[in-house]
Each structure stands twice: as C-alpha cells, then as structure tokens.
C-alpha cells in the first residue's frame, strides 16, 4: 500500500496535505508528493521527511487568465499529467489524495488514467473549478462543509494539525491582538493594523503582525515612522503559528478555510475580512456558518474602518445574563465546534473503503 498526495499552491491547501501526511506516517504508510514549481509547494515539501519522494512540475493555474494564457496553462497541465502517470505507475501507488489547487491537476488526472482510486479534500464552502470537475469521478470527496449535491461527499472534521488543539486555551481578556495576513500577505489587513496600532499600544494591548514577505520592509518602515517598531512583533511569516495563536486573545484574519478552522481549534475569537476577489466569493461562505452561530465577526473589506476593531472589542467585553464575557463564551464554543483527529478520520475512511 502506497499513497500519493497532490495539490497545494497556497498555505491553506498545503497545511491539509501536511496534516494527512503526518497521519499516514503515524500509521506506517509510505507516501509521495506531487506538486508544482509555481506557488509554495517546494517551500513546504522539497526537503520534507514526510514523503519518500517529491515531484514538482512546471504547471500554473488556469482560472482568471486570458484565452491564450489558459491554453498555455492547459498544455503544461497535460504535459505534467503524462509525467505523473509514469511516476504513479513506477511507485505502484494504490491511493491518491488531492487537497485541491491547480497543482493537484496532473496527479489527479493521472490517477484516473491509471485507474487508481482518487480521493479529494475540498477545503472551501464553495468548490474550486478543478474539484467541481473531478468530484463525480472521485471515490469520495471529504469536506467540513455540507454540499447540496451529496453524492459521494463525506462530512468530516477539518484536518487540522493536533498542535492547534494542543495550544488551545479559553480567552478571558483582550491583552494581545494578532493581525494575520495569510501566507501571501493581505494589504487591507496590513493597513488596518497600522491604523489601529497607535491606539492599541496606548491602551497597553500587545500586537503581533504577520504581514507577508512582500510587505515586510514596508511595514517595518511605517511602524518605525510611527515610533512603534519596538512595541510591535512584526514578522514576514512565522514558523510556529500555533504558539503565536496561543498568545493572542483576538485575531484579525482573511477567511481561507485552513485559517478559519485552525483558529477555531485554537479557540481564538476572530474578525474575518474575506478576500473580496476570491473565486465565487468562497472566503465569505467559509465563515458564513460561523457568523450565523455568533462565533465570529465578519467585516467586508470595503467597510474596514479602524473603529470596527474597537466596536468588536466592546462587544466581546460585554457580559451575558450569567455574567460571562462574550469573549469567553465564543472562545469556549469554538473549541467545541471542531473535533480532533480530522486527518485520522479521513485516512481510516479511505483504508476501510
């Protein structure tokens, strides 16, 4: 028995691949990885001991491109699919799991060509174009969101790494705010952090700001101009995000699915700013259920004024009829919403099929 994991591009997809790879390793099952040279795949897995072999193809996404660029991208995908077909055959792969993203294309189609059972994890509340096409052909589609076309869909807990649960805690007071721009940075959140930093630091609230590598020097300059560089923990990215989340009492974040569920597992109340240009507005739908259950605050990017942060802080500090702060209630309920061992459930479901 040997698995192939494929997909990625961004940290959200790749964190799922990592969680599944860790579970496969725990169960003594060998796995290989197939991704792309474009995006973050190599950064995450080029030297990862979780995989016996790692392959990266020259592929790019097809969505939101001009006609001629789409043709070029499709050609690269097809070329890589035939390479992947030989790789899967060479390694005698018995199961393929796609975590989505354009880099999942070649190995997913190669699995179908080789008649290898294909399993998909759909991370978002709205399916991406590749998964919409592949879902009917897959053995099973795992997701933490309920889809209308039930078919071969399996509702499971999100495959969050156990460290997010291990570092969870119940929040009782807002002393530390985390501005989380995501793996690619987020200009709107970076600006929101800068605008709020003077008032927050004046109130004695600590700030950790993960701004993305492209914005790091610029953010450093602006904080220095404000005289706040020594009062703000500023990072381009952070290798130990679980520890960063653990220290925070409130987070401001994009609404990529992995971030949403990792914050949930950590019990960290969050203001979500969905990326307005995400395909099919999927980031908004990723947190819609949370918003309906009063487990988060959602602010559209075009309404992101500095006062919004302090409005949310006031609401979180309010108490219910039992004398409990909304902050504490939300933190507790978030930890109850997601079950541990989502990755284990997915792997065991596949093995029992």
UniProtKB/Swiss-Prot annotation:
Keywords from the named record: Cell cycle, Cell division, Cell inner membrane, Cell membrane, Cell shape, Cell wall biogenesis/degradation, Glycosyltransferase, Membrane, Peptidoglycan synthesis, Transferase
Single GO cellular component term: plasma membrane
Broadest EC class assigned to this enzyme: transferase
Catalytic reaction(s) noted: di-trans,octa-cis-undecaprenyl diphospho-N-acetyl-alpha-D-muramoyl-L-alanyl-D-glutamyl-meso-2,6-diaminopimeloyl-D-alanyl-D-alanine + UDP-N-acetyl-alpha-D-glucosamine = di-trans,octa-cis-undecaprenyl diphospho-[N-acetyl-alpha-D-glucosaminyl-(1->4)]-N-acetyl-alpha-D-muramoyl-L-alanyl-D-glutamyl-meso-2,6-diaminopimeloyl-D-alanyl-D-alanine + UDP + H(+)
EC assignment: 2.4.1.227
Record keyword Glycosyltransferase present: yes
Keyword Transferase: yes
Subcellular location, record wording: Cell inner membrane
Pathway: Cell wall biogenesis; peptidoglycan biosynthesis
Role of this protein: Cell wall formation. Catalyzes the transfer of a GlcNAc subunit on undecaprenyl-pyrophosphoryl-MurNAc-pentapeptide (lipid intermediate I) to form undecaprenyl-pyrophosphoryl-MurNAc-(pentapeptide)GlcNAc (lipid intermediate II).
Name under which the protein is recorded: UDP-N-acetylglucosamine--N-acetylmuramyl-(pentapeptide) pyrophosphoryl-undecaprenol N-acetylglucosamine transferase
Taxonomic classification: Bacteria, Pseudomonadati, Campylobacterota, Epsilonproteobacteria, Campylobacterales
């Amino acid at each position: 028995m040997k698995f192939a994991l494929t997909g990625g591009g961004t940290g959200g997809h790749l964190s799922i691949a990592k969680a599944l790879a860790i579970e496969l390793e725990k169960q003594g099952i060998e796995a290989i990885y197939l991704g792309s040279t474009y995006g973050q795949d190599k950064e995450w897995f080029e030297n990862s001991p979780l995989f016996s072999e790692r392959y990266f193809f020259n592929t790019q996404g097809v969505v939101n491109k001009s006609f001629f660029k789409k043709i070029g991208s499709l050609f690269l995908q097809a070329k890589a699919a035939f390479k992947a077909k030989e790789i899967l055959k060479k390694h005698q792969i018995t199961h393929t799991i796609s975590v989505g993203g354009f880099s999942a294309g070649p190995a997913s189609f190669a699995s179908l060509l080789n008649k290898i059972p294909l399993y998909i994890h759909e991370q978002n509340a709205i399916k991406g174009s590749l998964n919409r096409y592949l879902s009917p052909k897959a053995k099973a589609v795992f997701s933490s969101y309920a889809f209308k076309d039930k078919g071969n869909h399996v509702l499971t807990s999100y495959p969050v790494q156990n460290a997010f649960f291990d570092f969870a805690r119940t929040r009782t007071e807002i002393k530390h705010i985390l501005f989380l721009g995501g793996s690619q940075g987020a200009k709107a959140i970076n600006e929101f952090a800068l605008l709020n930093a003077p008032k927050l630091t004046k109130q004695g609230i600590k700030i950790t700001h993960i701004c993305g590598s492209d914005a790091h020097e610029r953010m450093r300059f602006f904080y220095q101009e404000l005289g706040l560089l020594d009062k703000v923990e500023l990072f381009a990215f952070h290798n130990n995000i679980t520890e960063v989340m653990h220290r925070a009492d409130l987070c401001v974040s994009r609404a990529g699915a992995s971030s949403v569920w990792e914050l949930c597992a950590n019990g960290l109340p969050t203001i979500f700013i969905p990326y307005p240009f995400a395909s099919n507005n999927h980031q908004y739908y990723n947190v819609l259920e949370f918003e309906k259950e009063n487990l988060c605050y959602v602010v559209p990017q075009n309404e992101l004024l500095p006062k919004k942060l302090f409005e949310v802080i006031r609401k979180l500090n309010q108490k219910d009829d039992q004398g409990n702060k909304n902050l504490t209630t939300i933190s507790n309920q978030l930890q109850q919403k997601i079950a541990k061992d989502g990755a284990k459930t997915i792997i065991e479901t596949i093995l029992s099929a």
